[in-house]
Structure formats: C-alpha cells, structure tokens
Regions:
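Acidic, serine/threonine- and glycine-rich low-complexity intrinsically disordered segments
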Residues: 236-295
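Transmembrane alpha-helical segments of multi-pass membrane transport proteins and ion-pumping complexes
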Residues: 84, 88, 92, 96, ...
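Alpha-helical transmembrane segments of multi-pass integral membrane proteins
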Residues: 162-240, 272-283, 356-432
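Transmembrane alpha-helical segments in integral membrane proteins
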Residues: 67-86, 134-166, 221-241, 329-357, ...
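Long, glycine/tryptophan/cysteine-rich extracytoplasmic
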Residues: 74-148, 192-213, 271-338, 379-414, ...
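Alpha-helical transmembrane segments and their helix-start/interface "positive-inside/aromatic belt" motifs
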Residues: 63-89, 166-180, 245-261, 357-369
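Cys/His-rich metal-coordination motifs, chiefly Zn-binding "fingers/knuckles"
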Residues: 1-55
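Intrinsically disordered, low-complexity cytosolic tails and juxtamembrane linkers
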Residues: 48-71
Length: 432
C-alpha cells in the first residue's frame, strides 16, 4: 500500500531491476526512491529482465532475424561507420601535416593508412631490387594514438547506441556487436589499402616497395578497442550487482586504470623536477623528438608492468626486478612503483571481501583472470617493434631489430599469479 520495495523472491532466469530516476514513466509524477509502484497511478517502477538471453536464443533455436534484432545490427553498423568516418576526417588533417613536414614519404601514405595506424595495426613491408629482397615488420604501439579512436567511438555511441543500452544484457550484446563490426571494417580496409610503389629515382635499380597492414592485427585490435570502449562507456553502477563476472571485470579495469594514472602523475612530477632518470633508461634522447606527454604515456605502461614484476625491454635493455642495470636513485623510483601496485591490488582484494564474502575464492580467481587479460591487452597495444632484413643496393642485407615493451604471454602469466596472491592477501586482511 505504501509503495515501498517488497521482498520479492528471485527466479533463476529473471531478475527485477529498478528503473532509473524516481519519476513515473506513465504519469511523470515523482515518487519516493525505492518505491516499487507509482503512488499516483499504480504503474510499475521496475522492469523484469531475462538473465539468460544467450541460453534462450540457443535452446529455442531462434531465427537469424531474432538474433540480429537482439544485436541491434542496424544501429551497430551505423555506429561503426560513424566512428570510422570521424577518424577519416581526422586522418585528412594528419595527412596534410605529413605532406608539409615529410613530403618525401607523403606520397605513399593515404588517410586509410593513418586510420589503421591510429588503431595500432601491424605493418608488413617488402622491398625488392634486381640484386636482392628484404622484409620488415613494424608495430608502433604508442598508446597516445588510441585517443582518437576512443573519442570517435564514444561520440558515435552517444549518438546511436546509448538509448539502446537498457540493461546489462543489451550493454554486453551491443559491446560485442560493435567490437565485431568495428574490427571487421578495419580488417576489410586493410585489404584495399595495400601500397605498391616504384620510386622514380630508384627505377634504374628495379626497386619495388610493397607494404600493407596485417589483416589479423586490425581485426583483433578493432574488436578489443571497440568492445572495451563501448562497454566502459555504457556500463552503469546499477549493473554492478547483477553479475559477478561483469562486476569484477570492471573492478580489474578500474584497478589498472587507477595504477596507470597514478604512475603517470608521479613520472610527470619527477620528469619536470629532474629528468635524469630518463637518460639512464635510454629515453632522454627522445625528448627532443617527441612531446613529453607522448613519452610518459608510453613509459607509464612499461613502469606499471614492471611494478607487477614483469620484465620490460626499453631500447633493447632488459629491466627486471633481478636485473635493473640502473643507478640507485632510479631503482628507488621503480621499486616505489612496486609498492604502489601492491597497495592498489591489496585494496582491490579488500573490496572483493566486502562485496563477495560467500564467494571469496571464486571472486579472487575471476579478478586475477580479468586482471591478467587486461594486462595482456595493455602489453599487446604498448609494445614497439621494428625488425626484419632490409635489402640495400650494395647487395648487403642489414638486419636490425628494435623492441620496447613486454612479452604478452609472460605478462599474462606473471600478472595472473601476482594479482591472485596480492588480492588474496588483501581479501584476508579485511576483517570487517
């Protein structure tokens, strides 16, 4: 009678969710927060959602049209197209800058290549002359490049998909659908953006250049970037208690994001006061070529990985907990980052204890797996490599290799063990 929230029994397949706000959708009158029914017209202030959409689709053998309807395929394609359209406009401006500053190479670069570079695709290059051939593989995993794809995805999601995210299931479906669509579009673009060139000043030597972005790298990167951006943008606090896996995945993302931001701030303060530590790790020379924000955004990823006991390579120098090869003051900086990561993950373990007292081991395991996956994605996006053999006219093959970053496999294994142990300790330390 009072309209207060009733103690309703839960069904395994359905759940009751409160609608956003306190105004009735029928009569638009305001109600008390927590009310189950409108006190003016009696309309429901909650909705019943099916928790087993995926199972019901499979078990009932629904038609393809039904599945496509659940995925909002039309809106998803519009959203993906708009995201790439925004990137295309940005790429024309970047192309103009390249033409002004690097006119000697601008003729082989078009806006489609810039779009793929912004999504951190792997570049495969081949060259041949009358006297030999060579190949090169390059991945410029500069995290700052992701800013434009993320912004374009957020804008397009706000325009087309935001209203379609009515509950947790729709958020997951739309995130997966957008990730697939965005990744496929990038991969298809890579097929049509292959470059074959015969420089006029080298035509007497029969020099031919061929390069393209790797199909698989853009497909995978596009899915991950599209899925995570859409998921994080669409996720709401009211979904946190609906699914332990989704809640803890968000917790793992937040843990790494907080760690990254804090490390970036600390490194920025240190660099502005005394940048000598950059010289010790071989990055000081880049300050003249790149903005300090670009360098620190990249270095932050590597330092956070080191703080998780993961060996990192900077300018082909291995830095690990056992072998730093740096002076004492810089060692203190790196070791303080380890202490910071310990504190952040301990707090995450305490929070898990607070929310999931009855499912402690399961919750910690889910957190460690989620944490390892996100750390693996960070390692996959942030590594920089240029390697291969380049055939020169003097008939010599010069082999060169540059690598900065970490191994994706070792990153996932070490971060899983590290996060599991530390979060479990934090879980046990929480006695409240």
């Amino acid at each position: 009678k009072s309209g207060e929230l009733l103690n309703l029994n839960k069904n395994n397949n359905f759940q009751i969710e409160k609608l956003e706000g306190s105004n009735c959708a029928v009569c638009e009158c305001e109600n008390n927060i927590g009310s189950n029914y409108c006190k003016h017209c009696g309309a429901d202030l909650y909705e019943i959602n099916d928790k087993s959409q995926f199972e019901s689709i499979i078990k009932n053998n629904k038609s393809i049209n039904y599945i496509l309807e659940k995925f909002n395929i039309g809106k998803i394609l519009l959203t993906s197209s708009l995201s790439l359209g925004i990137l295309l406009v940005v790429s024309f401006f970047i192309k103009g800058f390249i033409s002004l500053e690097f006119s000697e190479i601008s003729y082989i670069i078009n806006p489609l290549h810039i779009i793929m570079a912004l999504n951190l695709g792997v570049l495969d290059g081949y060259s041949s002359t009358m006297v030999g051939s060579g190949s090169i593989e390059a991945h410029i995993g500069m995290l700052i490049l992701l800013i434009m794809p993320v912004i374009s995805i957020i804008i397009s999601n706000f325009i087309f998909l935001k209203k379609e995210n009515k509950d947790l299931n729709s958020v997951i479906l739309n995130s997966i659908g957008f990730g697939i669509s965005y990744g496929l579009m990038l991969a298809v673009i890579s097929i049509f953006a292959t470059v074959k060139s015969n420089p006029m000043d080298m035509i007497d030597y029969g020099l031919a250049i061929n390069f393209r972005y790797r199909f698989s790298s853009l497909l995978i990167n596009g899915f991950i970037i599209g899925f995570l951006t859409t998921y994080i943008f669409s996720f709401k606090k009211k979904y946190r208690n609906n699914n332990i896996y989704i809640d803890i995945l968000k917790n793992a993302i937040n843990t790494i994001a907080i760690g990254y931001i804090l490390v970036f701030i600390i490194l920025l303060i240190l660099t502005l006061s005394d940048s000598s530590f950059l010289n010790e790790i071989g990055l000081y020379g880049y300050l003249d070529k790149f903005n300090i924000g670009i360098i620190l955004s990249q270095l932050t990823a590597y330092v956070w990985e080191f703080a998780n006991f993961i060996p990192i390579s900077i300018n082909n120098n291995i830095i690990s907990i056992l072998n730093t090869g740096i002076f004492f003051n810089t060692k203190l900086i790196f070791y303080s980052m380890i202490a910071l990561s310990l504190l952040i993950i301990l707090i995450s373990g305490c929070n898990i204890k607070y929310k999931y007292k009855e499912n402690g081991k399961k919750a910690i395991l889910i957190f460690a797996i989620s944490y390892a996956i996100i750390m693996g994605i960070l390692a996959m996006f942030s590594y920089i490599t240029v390697g291969g053999n380049i055939s020169l006219l003097e008939m010599n093959n010069y082999k060169a290799s540059i690598f900065m970053g970490t191994s994706i496999t070792s990153t996932m294994i070490i971060s899983f063990i590290y996060s599991y142990v530390v979060s479990w300790i934090g879980y046990k330390l929480n006695t409240f």
